[in-house]
């Protein structure tokens, strides 16, 4: 004698009293399930049904449960929202009667294959969207191309040795910068011989940053001299650090300073820069992955130069607008270049933050160098640029 079946567990508890998830647009408002009359959620196995009846029908077919179903009342049960769990046989028969298709229920292997196909299609659509988005991103206008050309030329004319830096560099001898002698108050040490070597190249390096800025019409023609000086003092270390970081060589693990002197991390650190050395070397390693061209480096420098938050500026609004102009041209140029790195533009902008941090750390570090190193070792231009900076 057939036993009364256990009460069927619903598949809906996750939805609460009423399913409130995605409802297809082809359904009428509050359209009923053709099996039990509950609120339908879509077209399932050729019929418009609720989640509960969809799940019941799928489980029944997948697990081949229907041969074991029985009815206590000669298959005359009325199936509605309240009674649907009381008789599995009558519920299943009604599913068949209203047209639910057994052949559309997938077994485990087919279900896995279908999910994989859905996932592959989803990924394909994502890639197509990315390509479409990239194709639709604006590229530089005619005016922006002219601005980009001027900034790039300014950089190339003031970037020592240009693309030949590897052939023309000279390595600082290992014996220099490896034996620090003067302890500083923050626990680091300064090798005076290395410090002396670095000061020999600092003046031309600073001069090249000044020349770069003066070649930009927005800087030299639109801003008062006082603001020009403040901007140059603020960005000088940042731009020199960027130029050095772009000449990081992973094979020799060196940075080439001012296009001529290749130094190791410890040499730069012991020569006065301390922890700032680590930050510049780390930046060099990171930037190597970006494969930046001259134009991108030039535009980065222009963005650093036109920082309207430097203390003491009088034309902040004008400087901010100048920076926005460079940023927009920069973004459009990045769109034109079509890099393969995800989120390339925001990641590159984070390097501006890193360079600003390097500049701030160097301002603090400069105070230690002033205390620990003989005053005669400091070139006048070095003192003029970095003295009286906010820490």
From Swiss-Prot:
Designated gene of the protein: thra2
**Which Gene Ontology terms of cellular component type are present?**
RNA polymerase II transcription regulator complex
Q: Where is this region: Modulating?
A: 1-32
Q: What this chain does, per the record?
A: High affinity receptor for triiodothyronine.
Give the originating organism: Paralichthys olivaceus
Q: Which named protein is this?
A: Thyroid hormone receptor alpha-B
Q: List zinc finger spans: NR C4-type.
A: 33-53, 71-95
Presence of the UniProt keyword GTP-binding in the record: no
Q: What is its main location?
A: nucleus
Report the locations given in the UniProt record: Nucleus
Provide the residue ranges listed under DNA-binding region in this record: 33-100
Gene3D superfamilies named among the record's database cross-references = Erythroid Transcription Factor GATA-1, subunit A (3.30.50.10), Retinoid X Receptor (1.10.565.10)
Span of domain NR LBD: 143-388
UniProt cross-references to Pfam families, sorted A to Z: Hormone_recep (PF00104), zf-C4 (PF00105)
* Gene Ontology molecular function: any one: zinc ion binding
Q: Which family does it belong to?
A: Belongs to the nuclear hormone receptor family. NR1 subfamily.
- Swiss-Prot/TrEMBL GO biological process terms: cell differentiation; negative regulation of transcription by RNA polymerase II; positive regulation of transcription by RNA polymerase II; retinoic acid receptor signaling pathway; thyroid hormone receptor signaling pathway
Q: Which SUPFAM superfamilies match?
A: Glucocorticoid receptor-like (DNA-binding domain), Nuclear receptor ligand-binding domain
């Amino acid at each position: 004698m057939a036993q009364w079946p256990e009460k069927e567990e619903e598949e809906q508890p996750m939805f609460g009293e009423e399913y409130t998830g995605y409802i297809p647009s082809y359904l009428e408002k509050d359209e009923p399930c053709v099996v039990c009359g509950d609120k339908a959620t879509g077209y399932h196995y050729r019929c418009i049904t609720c989640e509960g009846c969809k799940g019941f029908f799928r489980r029944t077919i997948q697990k081949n449960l229907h041969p074991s179903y029985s009815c206590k009342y000669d298959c005359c049960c009325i199936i509605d929202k309240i009674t649907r769990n009381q008789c599995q046989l009558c519920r299943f028969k009604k599913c068949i009667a209203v047209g639910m298709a057994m052949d559309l229920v997938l077994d485990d292997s087919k279900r896995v294959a279908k999910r994989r196909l859905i996932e592959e299609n989803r990924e394909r659509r994502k890639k197509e969207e990315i390509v479409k988005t990239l194709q639709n991103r604006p590229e530089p206008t005619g005016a922006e191309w002219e601005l980009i050309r001027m900034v790039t030329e300014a950089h190339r004319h003031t970037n020592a040795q240009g693309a030949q830096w590897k052939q023309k560099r000279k390595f600082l001898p290992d014996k220099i910068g490896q034996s620090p002698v003067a302890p500083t108050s923050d626990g680091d040490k300064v090798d005076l011989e290395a410090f002396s070597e670095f000061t020999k190249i600092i003046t031309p390096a600073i001069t090249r940053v000044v020349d770069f800025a003066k070649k930009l019409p927005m800087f030299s023609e639109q801003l008062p001299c006082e603001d020009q000086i403040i901007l140059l003092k603020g960005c000088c270390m940042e731009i020199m650090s960027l130029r050095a970081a772009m000449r990081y060589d992973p094979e020799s693990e060196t940075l080439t300073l001012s296009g001529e002197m290749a130094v190791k991390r410890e040499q730069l650190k012991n020569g006065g820069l301390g922890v700032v050395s680590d930050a510049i070397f780390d930046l060099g390693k990171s930037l190597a992955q970006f494969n930046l061209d001259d134009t991108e480096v030039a535009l980065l420098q222009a963005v650093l130069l036109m920082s309207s938050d430097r203390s003491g500026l009088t034309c902040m609004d004008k400087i901010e607008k100048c920076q926005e102009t460079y940023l927009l041209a920069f973004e459009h140029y990045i769109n034109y270049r079509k890099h393969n790195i995800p989120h390339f533009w925001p990641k590159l902008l984070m390097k501006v933050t890193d360079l600003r941090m390097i500049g701030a750390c160097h301002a603090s570090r400069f105070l230690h160098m002033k205390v620990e190193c003989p005053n005669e070792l400091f070139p006048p231009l070095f003192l003029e640029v970095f003295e009286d900076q906010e820490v």
